[in-house]
Amino acid sequence: MQLVLCLLHFIELPLKHLFKFYVGPTSGPRSWSSRLGKQISTLPDNLENIVDFEPVKGRVIAVDDELLTNSDQKYAYYLALGIQNGAEFLIEIMGLCPDLPCEMNVARWLNPASYAMRKYVQTKNPTNALKRLIVIILNWYLPLFFEIKKDCHVKYGALHFFQAIRYAQECFTEKEKKKAWKYFKINAYMAHPESVLLAGICHPFKSIRVKCAEIIIKARVKARRTNEVRPFKVPELNFDAENFLEMIDLSRPDVTPPPLLKNFSDDDLRLIAEDGNIELPEIHCHSIMNERAVKDTTTASQREIGQKKSHEHILNLIANRASIPYKHKKGDFVPKK
């Protein structure tokens, strides 16, 4: 079985601890204890006009609207584009931007990122801590977030992980790297040889496909000889790697072949290495759809009796979402005090 862990959850962990580094520890599920933290978490009650802020160079680029699957993502996306292009541009596109999420939730890191960006654009003289958070959000967190959503197949998992390292090397300070590398190391599941080799056999460059096919075939021979259950260990990372194949040591004797390729013979792999044609199951490198499916299944089982009724409930729910998009929340209909 191919082990797949959510990359969107992975990128939240370094961001969480970099927020803690600059804003301090949380004082609850919706706030921080520091002055800046309180200003960010209470932003809905203290919104001000956008000032002539200093634009921040970032990596967030234009994405298709279909990738922006909820209001939080749309808000973060348009605000990021505005900060990169300046106050006049941001004011022009604010009509495309949904309202600020009504409550800050530190368990949903896209939400604090949006709050920090909104705080920045209304602050004439932002602190260095706030500036650094904006640099990290625009050059590391949000670019990775949208890249993972765009190329969501598991075959891209190792490439996204390597990109996370590369972006961090370019925009993190040495102190920030010291804080963040720990969480790269303990969550390097997508840098496991099985994920790296899967990305390699699907790579557009023939030389990389051929190299990975040879490693997979050799690993298969060794696995057949031992006939043991493979131990899955988080690999040691090379943070100075020039490409994704170098971020771990693929010459180690404990390298194992990707389970997702078990139905492909050695000859199939050699052919794939030559022409690049491969069909794999649609498995994502993030778990957003899984989490939504779990929620829908739980709701259906609570409201219906029997598997057939529960299944019909889920199908109706999916059809309703497609035909009647959800755009309103309870707060839109309840007068604010």
Residue ranges: model-predicted function:
Residues 1-337:
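Alpha-helical structural modules in large enzymes and assemblies
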